[in-house]
């Protein structure tokens, strides 16, 4: 992730249009953005950007984006308006490094920590809490904590998680049908 990016946000893909995706921002992690949606331009020609097909509608991502301030002279072709460099004040997502993380619930995975090869976009790692990433971008969490949180879990831990899930499967029949609010204080 790039703390020097113009905008870092958590958002959900709501639409794909040509080589761009429209995101609904859920949380701004770095920078400022005030609109209800944001257009992010992806791969076309030989620009160092990921393909739009990697970001399906409904998927959630943390993206470190660069704002388009100027469109190059050959950046727009009227015969293919949905395949272009992008428009001024929209954003681009680079694939030349770790600029996006896949989000699942309250965690994210991807090319997160410094030192990972720049084109290694799906590393073996543990999911990292979004709040930890936000704390890192705010300067409240050190890089070492982020690196430690992302370390791949040992196989023993994965086995323990699977054993626990297996043990708990079917246990709902043994639990009372009351919520904590229904219980009386002693």
Each model region followed by its residue ranges:
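OB-fold (S1/OB) nucleic-acid-binding surfaces
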Residues: 19-43
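Short, well-structured alpha-helical interface segments that form or flank functional binding sites
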Residues: 6-8, 42, 56
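N-terminal post-signal-peptidase region of extra-cytosolic proteins
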Residues: 1, 39-51
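N-terminal low-complexity, Pro/Thr/Ser-rich intrinsically disordered segments
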Residues: 1-2, 183
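Netrin-like (NTR/C345C) domain of secreted extracellular proteins
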Residues: 48-186
């Amino acid at each position: 992730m790039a703390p020097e990016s113009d905008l870092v946000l958590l958002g959900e893909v709501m639409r794909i249009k040509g080589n761009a995706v429209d995101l609904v921002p859920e949380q701004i992690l770095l920078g400022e953005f005030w609109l209800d949606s944001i257009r992010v331009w992806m791969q076309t020609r030989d620009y160092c950007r990921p393909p739009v097909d990697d970001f399906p509608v409904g998927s959630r991502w943390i993206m470190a984006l660069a704002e388009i301030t100027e469109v190059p002279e050959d950046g727009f072709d009227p015969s293919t308006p949905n395949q272009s460099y992008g428009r001024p004040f929209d954003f681009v997502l680079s694939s030349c490094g770790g600029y996006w993380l896949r989000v699942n619930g309250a965690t994210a995975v991807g090319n997160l920590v410094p030192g990972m090869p720049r084109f290694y976009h799906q590393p073996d790692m543990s999911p990292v809490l979004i709040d930890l990433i936000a704390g890192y971008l705010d300067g409240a969490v050190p890089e070492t904590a982020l690196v430690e949180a992302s370390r791949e879990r040992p196989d023993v831990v994965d086995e323990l998680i699977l054993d626990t899930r297996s043990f708990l499967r079917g246990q709902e029949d043994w639990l009372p049908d009351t919520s904590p609010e229904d219980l009386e204080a002693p």
